[in-house]
């Protein structure tokens, strides 16, 4: 479990690690990061914005902290040839992963975005992090890497993979999946 303040203190480092380790697997297509930044929303809320493109598809996503569930939250918008896919059905057609995804108003930006539902995230991440090896990063970065692997972009688009080796060198097979 992490707090909003811990999220705020670590989001920039996490985004840097995530972008350095984001891969597109099982395809010859390349992807590009068009834009990324971390923004302070108000006195105590921060979020990151990342935009990636694969051929004509653009995925804009934010990572923020949801106070109600006490977990990070992924919101995204999809574009085809720079045309915003406004219909929820068109959005759902392209989001083919295993997480529950709904169209909601972004809790900070107050515009319609697809949202990976945060239900059960807290328990899932806590159980994944039980008995983990010593991490070469702080525990918040470890938590965010685990969360992103399970509930972030790869959960919706399994072609994306992020597998940073966050553990101390001599530990075998400890990459976040």
UniProtKB/Swiss-Prot annotation:
Q: What does this protein do?
A: E2-like enzyme required for the cytoplasm to vacuole transport (Cvt), autophagy and nucleophagy. Acts as an E2-like enzyme that catalyzes the conjugation of ATG12 to ATG5. ATG12 conjugation to ATG5 is required for proper localization of ATG8 to the preautophagosomal structure (PAS). Likely serves as an ATG5-recognition molecule.
* Listed GO CC annotations: phagophore assembly site; phagophore assembly site membrane
What keyword terms does UniProt attach to this protein? Autophagy, Membrane, Protein transport, Transferase, Transport, Ubl conjugation pathway
List, alphabetically, the InterPro entries matched. Answer: Atg3/Atg10
- What triggers production of this protein? Expression is decreased upon fluphenazine treatment.
EC identifiers of the protein? 2.3.2.-
Q: Which species is the source of this protein?
A: Candida albicans (strain SC5314 / ATCC MYA-2876) (Yeast)
Q: Describe its membrane topology.
A: Peripheral membrane protein
- One GO term (biological process): glycophagy
Descriptive protein name: Ubiquitin-like-conjugating enzyme ATG10
Q: How does this protein assemble?
A: Forms homooligomers.
């Amino acid at each position: 479990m992490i707090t909003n303040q811990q999220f705020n203190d670590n989001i920039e480092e996490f985004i840097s690690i995530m972008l350095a380790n984001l891969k597109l697997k099982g395809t010859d297509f390349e992807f590009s990061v068009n834009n990324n930044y971390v923004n302070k929303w108000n006195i105590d809320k921060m979020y990151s914005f990342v935009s990636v493109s694969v051929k004509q598809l653009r995925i804009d996503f934010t990572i923020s902290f949801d106070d109600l569930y006490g977990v990070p939250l992924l919101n995204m918008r999809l574009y085809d040839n720079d045309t915003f896919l406004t219909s929820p059905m068109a959005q759902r057609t392209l989001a083919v992963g295993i997480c529950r995804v709904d169209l909601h108003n972004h809790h900070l930006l107050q515009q319609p975005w697809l949202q990976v539902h945060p239900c059960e995230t807290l328990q899932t991440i806590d159980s994944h992090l039980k008995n983990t090896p010593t991490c070469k990063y702080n525990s918040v970065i470890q938590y965010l890497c685990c969360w992103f692997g399970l509930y972030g972009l790869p959960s919706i688009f399994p072609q994306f993979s992020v597998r940073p080796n966050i553990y101390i060198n001599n530990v075998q097979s400890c990459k976040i999946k």
